[in-house]
UniProtKB/Swiss-Prot annotation:
It comes from the Bacteria. It catalyses: 4-hydroxy-2-oxoheptanedioate = succinate semialdehyde + pyruvate. Homohexamer; trimer of dimers. This is 4-hydroxy-2-oxo-heptane-1,7-dioate aldolase. The record marks D84 as: Increases basicity of active site His. Belongs to the HpcH/HpaI aldolase family. The gene is hpcH. A divalent metal cation binds at E149, D175.
Length: 263
């Protein structure tokens, strides 16, 4: 078993991604052919469940883009289901400390290394037990990325980085800026300083730093600092702003107030 995304991070090859929030397999397949290295299927803020994640994994599978799945929470039951339908790389939200990071890793590993339940006869991940020795290969193919999104998590970053099995740490600029008192303004100098310091610290620890940033200048800055998995856009934003701009160019009567938001 292989995990091309995990291998790329280990090799230090920057991976450029796109966020998927439309919760639809047709749009996921369309975007899988756009040339991004990875696509984030969002189960935290988009209306996804295990079934819709499955159909998007199936839609993306024939393409080079690698899927990353974000569950709604650091929940071992939900993680088990996502792994069974074929997710190999998970982005775990709101990890605050090393204990929570260890729990995330344990949820992705079969015993004795972890607590993942064994149900491979029912699992797409094992191709319904057609992958030889799946139970002994699966652990090494898992890629665990944890999100730090608060001042508390930032203060615990060093201990989180010490957790065995953590492949990367993703900085959540929207929640971090809100927690720091600058909601809706991740470009505030204090927030930017925290982000840049974290990227350098994560990379120095031998882990992969990641972030979502639609501002192209900032995204390139993070890559220069050593970020290895950077999402540079969101499908819902691309569609909404593109449609609004097209309507405006043809003098559409409905006048929209200026769109706002972090991404």
């Amino acid at each position: 078993m292989k995990n091309a995304f995990k291998d790329a991070l280990k090799a230090g090859r920057p991976q450029i991604g796109l966020w998927l929030g439309l919760a639809n397999s047709y749009s996921a397949e369309l975007l899988a052919g756009a040339g991004f290295d990875w696509l984030l299927i969002d189960g935290e803020h988009a209306p996804n469940n295990v079934q819709t994640v499955l159909t998007q994994l199936q839609a993306i599978a024939p393409y080079p883009s690698q899927p990353v799945v974000r569950p709604s929470w650091n929940d071992p039951v939900q993680i088990k289901q996502l792994l069974d339908v074929g997710a190999q790389t998970l982005l775990i939200p709101m990890v605050q400390n090393a204990d929570e990071a260890r729990n995330a890793v344990a949820a992705t590993r079969y015993p004795p290394a972890g607590i993942r339940g064994v149900g491979s006869a029912l699992a797409r991940a094992s191709r319904w037990n057609r992958i030889p020795d799946y139970l002994h290969q699966a652990n090494d193919a898992m890629c665990v990325l944890v999100q730090i999104e608060t001042r508390e998590a930032m203060s615990n970053l060093a201990s989180i980085l010490d957790v065995d099995g953590i492949d990367g740490v993703f900085i959540g600029p929207a929640d971090l800026s809100a927690d720091m008192g600058f909601a809706g303004n991740p470009q505030h100098p204090e927030v930017q300083a925290a982000i840049e310091n974290a990227i350098v610290q994560i990379r120095a620890a031998g882990k992969a730093p990641g972030i979502l940033m639609a501002n192209e200048a900032l995204a390139k800055r993070y890559l220069e600092l050593g970020a290895l998995f950077v999402a540079v856009g969101v499908d819902t934003t691309l569609l909404a702003r593109g449609a609004e701009a097209l309507a405006a160019r043809f003098g559409a009567e409905k006048k929209l107030s200026g769109a706002s938001g972090v991404y």
